[in-house]
Amino acid sequence: MHITRGPNGEFVISYAIADVAAFVSPGDPIDLEAHRRGVTLYAPDCRTPLHPPVLSERAASLLPNEVRPALLWTITLNPRGQMVAAEVARALVRSRAQLSYRQAQAEIDGITPRPTLGLLKLVGQWREFRERERGGASLKIPQQEIQPHGDGWTLGFRAPEPVEAWNAQISLLTGMAAAHIMLYGQVGILRTMPPADLDSLRRLRQVAKALRIVWPPEMDYPDLVRMLNPAWPDHAAMLSAATVLFRGAGYRSFSGGIPEDADHAALASDYAHITAPLRRLVDRYSGEICVALSADQPVPAWVFHALDGLPEQMAAAERRAKRYERAIIDLLEVGPPAGQQGRPDVHRHGDRSQS
């Protein structure tokens, strides 16, 4: 990612995404297996990748100081963070640095952050303002982490850094740009989410009451979740409970017209998955469609042929991934903490002890 400021105060964002189609051909064994898997699966000590590691971690990955093929987005925002233009084309890129969120946040909080990081904060905050303006909501959910510890594991939570939300806004912006291009071209696949139902909202208000979180009757849930601090335990619990309002997400493919009921209610915008083709199958297809439409070229036939089946393939992959991740968390939650294995839990009752 690279961000510059134009002469009239506009922001120009260059956002590079791995070009998986430069390495994977339609119908080859890697492509067929990727369709079977759908997404990358994550475990504490390993991952089951969507693509072979020689691609996902090396040849196709945008590693620092390496020249790689990419889909390069150029998105222009006006000085108040509104998108005014977007296009994508194939390019060769060289990544200059790879920073963790903590490293990026430390640099932003320092005296002289590199220009892109300084502008990332400004653009991210403007995009958060635009999200509030259109009635969208992004959950800053504490991350549940499993870390190796000696011979065992520890389970904990980590509140996200502010830079994570700003970076997420750039990804969301790119997904919205992709959705706009596909809707204009009347062909593509969108990420969808239905509005929250009234019963779920009523239950969530009961949770807020139990946690002693003030939620005025006139306040909508997007305004509530924005005021919550994930570093506070009661707010973290409320944010976790609020995920019930974000259920029902899916995909909607279309061609030859504009689909109905294809909005993403949580974002209050049209939206597409496009930024993670190395770990999510659908993003490769969204990218190919946007590259073709940006160049006023026909969408490749192999993309058209796969569109109808992608929503169900991705739904099955997401269900499998959720079962897998939940099983791992359940296993860790019922196990003893690291360093406590084999230690008896003794309760005395009169002359008897139980362990």
Placement of each model-derived feature along the sequence:
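Electropositive polyanion-binding surfaces
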Residues: M1-S355
